[in-house]
Amino acid sequence: MASVKDRRVESPATDTDLGRGVFEFSDRYSVFDWGEMPDHVPGKGASLCTMGAYTFEQLAAAGVPTHYQGVRTPDGETVRLADAPEAPTQMVIDLTQVPTLPFEDGSYDYDRYHDAGGSNYLVPLEVVFRNAVPVGSSLRTRCAPADVGIDADEWPQGPVELPETIVEFSTKYEEQDRYLSRSMADEIAGDADIAELDALARRVNETITDCAADAGFVHDDGKLECVYVDGEVRVADVAGTFDENRFRFDGREVSKEAVRQFYKRSDPEWVGAVKDAKRAADERGVADWKSLCEPSPDPLPPEILQAAADLYAAGANRYTAREWFDAPPLGDALDAFE
């Protein structure tokens, strides 16, 4: 489960105090939980850092607690996004404890995770909020339309709006994402309260949805991570980016989902092998599903790689209402994926 960003510790967290760290955003990307893909998308790291910082500052204005402290400039200062001289690639954050999640005898040991984390830890869940069901949503494989209030026997081919926002919980540190019942999520969350995580996710969703609307986007869904500190849950990791959220512009996908869908069309052998390997790993009770997947992904064609770079850059310009990047109109970048 390789990340697209690196975490640098400047002062470590302890049982009683938060630390200080820096996210260094790279141009790496990952689809289908593969980890680092063959290509790097030029400028992607700066795009994600810029959008994430913008979102965190909007959340702060709305009174939502987060771990964000600012962005790091080339000369080492920590400033608000508006004061950054160029699109940043480093984000300064409060650090909490992130214990190792043990895997033994075919299962994960969350009791040991929480014993190590105490009352200051990263909640080992992803909190997912859904306003709509786009083409690539896992909800389409896990639920019938009627289960989520949609009056249809089968899922429509295009995105479909939900009658009300849905909040779900999935595992964070397992080799495969696993959606959970509320009771199981509550158990895995430790001292963090599921109702508070749900409420926090809805506040984050509202803020990102408003930011998206101001930029001419439709916000379909997203995910967030949270820290639990001194009895309070706060937004962690990064939020409101094209990797954590799915948006639409003029009815077309504006997120990492565009690359996922390209791979489904252009490299179905690898996509199918990933699915089969995950299923086999579940059946065998092993964590490392990639060792069961023989094919590797093909590199992106040069024109698609450039289109992905343009998507991230042009989309970040639009979302933040500032021309950070020299990029073509967003619609032109999206044309290449069709």
From Swiss-Prot:
GO molecular function, one term: phosphoribosylaminoimidazolesuccinocarboxamide synthase activity
Keywords: ATP-binding, Ligase, Nucleotide-binding, Purine biosynthesis
Pfam families named in the record: SAICAR_synt
Keyword Nucleotide-binding belongs to the record: yes
Annotated TM spans: none
Catalytic activity annotation: 5-amino-1-(5-phospho-D-ribosyl)imidazole-4-carboxylate + L-aspartate + ATP = (2S)-2-[5-amino-1-(5-phospho-beta-D-ribosyl)imidazole-4-carboxamido]succinate + ADP + phosphate + 2 H(+)
InterPro entries: SAICAR_synt/ADE2_N
Pathway this chain belongs to: Purine metabolism; IMP biosynthesis via de novo pathway; 5-amino-1-(5-phospho-D-ribosyl)imidazole-4-carboxamide from 5-amino-1-(5-phospho-D-ribosyl)imidazole-4-carboxylate: step 1/2
Enzyme class: ligase
Family: Belongs to the SAICAR synthetase family. Highly divergent.
Official protein name in the record: Putative phosphoribosylaminoimidazole-succinocarboxamide synthase
Source organism (scientific name): Halobacterium salinarum (strain ATCC 700922 / JCM 11081 / NRC-1) (Halobacterium halobium)
Gene name in the database record: purC
